Amino acid sequence: MAEKAKKKKNGGGGNQRIAFYKLFTFADRYDIVLMVIGTLSAMANGLTQPFMSILMGQLINVFGFSDHDHVFKEVSKVAVKFLYLAAYAGVVSFLQVSCWMVTGERQSTRIRRLYLKTILRQDIGFFDTETNTGEVIGRMSGDTILIQDSMGEKVGKFTQLVSSFVGGFTVAFIVGMKLTLALLPCVPLIVGTGGAMTYIMSKKAQRVQLAYTEAGNVVQQAVGSIRTVVAFTGEKQSMGKYEKKLEIAYKSMVKQGLYSGLGIGIMMVVVYCTYGFAIWYGARQIIEKGYTGGQVMNVITSILTGGMALGQTLPSLNSFAAGTAAAYKMFETIKRKPKIDAYDMSGEVLEEIKGDIELRDVYFRYPARPDVQIFVGFSLTVPNGMTVALVGQSGSGKSTVISLIERFYDPESGEVLIDGIDLKKFQVKWIRSKIGLVSQEPILFATTIRENIVYGKKDASDQEIRTALKLANASNFIDKLPQGLETMVGEHGTQLSGGQKQRIAIARAILKNPKILLLDEATSALDAESERIVQDALVKLMLSRTTVVVAHRLTTIRTADMIAVVQQGKVIEKGTHDEMIKDPEGTYSQLVRLQEGSKKEEAIDKEPEKCEMSLEIESSDSQNGIHSGTLTSPSGLPGVISLDQTEEFHENISSTKTQTVKKGKEVSLRRLAHLNKPEISVLLLGSLAAVIHGIVFPVQGLLLSRTIRIFFEPSNKLKNDSLFWALIFVALGLTDLIVIPLQNYLFAIAGAKLIKRIRSLSFDRVLHQDISWFDDTKNSSGVIGARLSTDASTVKSIVGDVLGLIMQNMATIIGAFIIAFTANWLLALMALLVAPVMFFQGYYQIKFITGFGAKARGKYEEASQVASDAVSSIRTVASFCAEDKVMDLYQEKCDEPKQQGFKLGLVSGLCYGGSYLALYVIESVCFLGGSWLIQNRRATFGEFFQVFFALTLTAVGVTQTSTMAPDINKAKDSAASIFDILDSKPKIDSSSEKGTILPIVHGDIELQHVSFRYPMRPDIQIFSDLCLTISSGQTVALVGESGSGKSTVISLLERFYDPDSGKILLDQVEIQSLKLSWLREQMGLVSQEPVLFNETIGSNIAYGKIGGATEEEIITAAKAANVHNFISSLPQGYETSVGERGVQLSGGQKQRIAIARAILKDPKILLLDEATSALDAESERVVQDALDQVMVNRTTVVVAHLLTTIKDADMIAVVKNGVIAESGRHETLMEISGGAYASLVAFNMSAN
C-alpha cells in the first residue's frame, strides 16, 4: 500500500515541473542584486555580437571600396573601435559569469538547507508513507546539482544569447529593413524547433531523475545494512535491483540525445537555408535597390548571429528543463505544511508541568497502514509521579502509546492529555523537551559519544555529561576507550555493542532531565549486571517523574505503581502486580505464569552478568587491560571506530588517501576512455560525425569569404554566382541535418553506457568490500549514495558533451588552418602567431579552475552524511528536539564548499572575460596586419577574408571548449573518486570465485589460538590466543560481559573479519581457503537488532533463499518462526510493506521475520546473536521452541544475555579477557566453586 502510494506520488500524472521563475523563490536581497547585475551584464554582453556585425559591415565596405594606398589608414579607424569593443566585452562577460555563478552557489546551498530543515520538521507519518533516506540523499546531492546548474551561469548565458538575438535583429532592421523582413519568417522555425525539443527533453530528464532516485534507495538500503546483505549473500540481489533502475535511466538518456540532435539538426538546416536565401535575395537588392555589399553582409551576419544565438540556447534550455523537473519534488516538500510542526512556536507553554497523562477514548491507525486499526477506544490515566508499565503481546500497541504521548502521531479521534490539556494545544517543541525517550533499538548518530550524549542537552558541561554517564553505568566502558568520549560510534552506532549503545541512549535521556519518562524496552539489550545497575539508575531517575514503561521482562516492572495489560487495541486489565496476580484467570497472571514456567532458567537467565561485573571491576583499574573496552557492532557484529585512533595513524591514512586520489587524477582520463572501450565503434562513428560537424564551420567561413567577393562583382555575374553559392549553403545545412543527430545520439549512447557501467561497477565493488571498509566513516551509506549519484553524472559530461565538442573543435581548427594556408601563407602565419594567445587563454582557464572542485565535493559528502543520519533517525531527532542541532552541523559542513563555489565563480568570470577580451584584440590586430599586407600588395581582399573567417570561427570553437573547463575539471575529480572505489582491493572479497567447496558439510567448528583486533582499532586487543571447539550438531552458548567479544566470534565465523593470527576451521578446513560466498551460504545469522529492507514482508523472508522462494516455502518458514498468524491478520498479508528499516513493525515482529528468513535459508550452521532479546515472554517461548526444532542436527552458536535460552546448551563458554575462561555444560560449570559462570548464576539468583 505504502509502495503504491509512493509510486503514485513519484510518477503520477500532471506535468511534474515548476515554473522557471519559481527556482529563484529563495533568493535574498544580495542575490537579487547579483542577479540584476548579472542579467544587465549578460544583456550588454549579448550586444557585442550585433556591434561586431556593424563594425564588420564598415570593414567590408572599407576593404571593398578603398584603393590599395589608403586601406591601412581606413582600417585602423575601425580597428580602434574593435579595441573599445574588446574592453567592453571583457568587463561585462566577467560580471555576467561571476555574478550568476556566485548567486547560483548561494541559492542552491540555501535550497539544500531549506529542504533538510523542512524534512526535519515533517510529521513522522510523512516518513512512513512519502519518503525515505535514500530519496532525501538523492535529492540533496543529485537534484540540487541540477537545480544549481539551471540557476547559475546558464541563466547568464541564456540571457546573453537572447540579447544577441534581439540585438542582431534590431541592427538588421536599421541597416536593411527590406532584406530583414524577407528573412524574418525563418526565425519562428528556429524558435519552434528549439521549444518542441526542450519540452521532449524535460520529459526524458524527469524519467532519468526518477530512476536515479530509486537507484539511490537501493544503495542506501544495501550499504546501510551491509552485514545483513553479505551474511545472506544478497549482493547479487541488490545489484539486480540497482541495474534494473539504471536500465530505465539509460534508455531515457539515449532518447534525450537523439531528440536534442534532431532538434539542433533541423535548426541548422533552417539557418543555412536562411543564409542561402539571404545571399540570393541580397544580390537582387544590390542590383535593384542599390544596397552595398557591406550592408547585405551586415544584415546576414546580424540575423544569423542572432538566429545562431537562439540555437545555442539549447544547453541552457536543457539545464532549465532538468532543473525545474528536479526542483518540483524538492519545492513541493519545502512548501508542505506538516500536520504536527516541530517549528511551530504557537501553542501553550506552561510555567510548570506536573506530568499527569491521560489517553481518553483513543482511536488510532498508522498512516502507512490505514487498514489496520491499532486502538479502538483506548483509555489510560497516569497520575503525575507514578510509574505505569504496559504489558501485552508483541505488536499489541504498547509502543504506540509512547508514540502518541511524544506526539509523533495524532489520534483519529479521542484525546491525549497532559496536565488536563490536549497535547495538540501545546507548543510541540516545548512539550517534547519535557519528555525523555529511551527506545528499544537505541539510535545513535555517526559522530562521537560526547556529541551523541549532548543531544539530551545542548550546552551540557563536562561534569553533567560525566554524571549522566555514571548514572547510566556507561562511564567504565567509555573510560577504557583510547579516545574516551571522543570515540566515533560509527553509522547507526555500529562500533558499539547493543548494551553499550543502550547505556549511551539512557545517559542522553538522563541529561535531558525530563518531567515525563518513556522507556520502551529500555533495558532489553543489556546483560543482567548492566541491567541491574541501569535499572537502579532508572529507578532513581523515575523518582518524582511520571514514567511509562513498556517491557517484556516482567521482573523489571513488578514494582510499578500500576501495570496495564494491552490487548487488541484496549486496556483489558490494570492494577498493581499484587492485585492482578490474585486473579488466576487474568491475562496478567497467565503472562506471569508463562515466565514463571521458565523462572529457574530466568535466574540463570540474568546471569552472564555476574561475570560481567567482576570483569568490569578487574579491568577498570588497568587502562591497558586486554579487554580495554572492546566495541562490538549493533547487530552484534563487531565494528570499528573512527580513523582518528591516534594522530599519527590518522595522518598516515589520510596522506596515503590523498596520494591515491592524486595518482587517480593523472590516469583518470585515459582510464575513463578505457571504461568506454566496449562502445569504441559508437565513439568512432560519433567522432566521425563530430569531425564532419566541425569542418562545417571553416567551410562556412570559406563560403562567406567567397560570398563577400561576389557582392562587389558586376550585376550579370552577381546574379548567377549568388544562386550557386546559395545552393551550396543549403547543401551545408543538409550535411548538418545528418551529422548532428548522429553525433548527439551516438555520444548519448556512449555517455549513458559509461554512466551505467560506472555506477554498476562502483556499486558492485562497494558491495564486495570487506566489512572494515564500511567501518570507516568515509564510507557510510550517505556518502556512498552521494558519490555514486554525483560522480557518475559528472563523469558522463566528459564523454557525452565534452568529447563530442573536442573532436568537433579539433576538426574546426585543422580545417580552418588548411583553408587559411591555401589562401595566403603570410596572412595564415600572422593568424598562427596570434592564435597561441587564444589557446593559452583556454589552457589557463582550465588550470585556474582546477583545485577547487575536489575539496568542496568531499565536504558536500560529509554534509550528506549528516542529513542521512538525521533522516534515518527522525524519531530520535524529533524526540530530542535536535532539529536545530542537525541544521547547525549541516550548515557547518556546507560552509567551505560554498566559499569554494564563490572563488570558482570569480575565477571563471575572469577567464571568460579574458577570452572575449583576447578574441577582439586579436581580431583588431589581424585587421591592421591584413590591411598592411593588402596595401603592400602581398595579399588580396578575398584572401584576407578567407583567412579571417577561418580564424574567427576557430577562435569561437576554442573559446567554446574552454567554457567546458569546469565540466572537465569536475569530471576529473569525480573520476578520481570513482577509481578510488574501483581500485580498493578488499582483503576479504565475496565476489571471488576462488576457494574450495566441501562436498558435505558436517559443521565441526574450531577456533585455534585466535588473536584479533579490529582493523581500525589496532590499539585494543579483543582476543589473545582464544581456543574453542564446537562439534557438529552441538549448541554452544557464549556468555560474558557486554563488550567482551562474544559477538566477535560470530563475525569471525561469517568472515566479516579475519583473525590477526591463529586459524578458524570448518570440518578441519581453514575457512580462509573456502569459497567465501559458499561459506556464508552454510550459515544462518539472526542478529540482536534485525535489519529488514523497505519492501514487503514476503520479500524480506524470501531474502533468505538464493534464487527466490515459493509462497509455500515462505509461509512454512513464517509458521516455524511463529509470525504467520500476525502476518495473515494484516489486510495485505505478506504484501505489507515493512517501511524503512522495518519501522512499521514492532521489535518482536521484526525479530520473528528475521528468524523466518534464517529458517528459510536452511543453514548447516546457525548463529544466534541475542536472537530473542526483543520478544515478549509468549513470543519468546514459541520462537524458542521453533529455534529448538531448527537447531536439531545443526551446529549452533548462541550469544545470549537471557540464560533461559542457554541452560540446555551442549556447552557454555565464558568469554573473558580475550580468551575462553571456562567451558562445559551448565551442571559441570556450576560445580566449579568460585568459577566465573557459577558466580554469575549465584549473583543472578540473589538479584532475582
Curated annotation (Swiss-Prot):
The keyword Transcription does not apply. Glycans are attached at residues 473, 652, 720, 779, 1094, 1193, 1244. Residues 35-322, 683-970 form the ABC transmembrane type-1 domain. It is found in: Membrane. One of its GO terms (cellular component) is plasma membrane. Keywords: ATP-binding, Glycoprotein, Membrane, Nucleotide-binding, Repeat, Transmembrane, Transmembrane helix, Transport. The keyword Disulfide bond does not apply. Residues 357-593, 1005-1242 form the ABC transporter domain. Its main location: membrane. Pfam families: ABC_membrane (PF00664), ABC_tran (PF00005). The chain crosses the membrane at residues 32-52, 82-102, 158-175, 179-201, 261-281, 299-321, 682-702, 722-742, 813-833, 834-854, 914-934, 939-959. It is a multi-pass membrane protein. ATP 1 binds at residues 392-399. GO terms for molecular function: ABC-type transporter activity; ATP binding; ATP hydrolysis activity. ATP 2 binds at residues 1040-1047. InterPro entries: AAA+_ATPase (IPR003593), ABC1_TM_dom (IPR011527), ABC1_TM_sf (IPR036640), ABC_transporter-like_ATP-bd (IPR003439), ABC_transporter-like_CS (IPR017871), P-loop_NTPase (IPR027417), Type_1_exporter (IPR039421). Belongs to the ABC transporter superfamily. ABCB family. Multidrug resistance exporter (TC 3.A.1.201) subfamily. This is ABC transporter B family member 7.
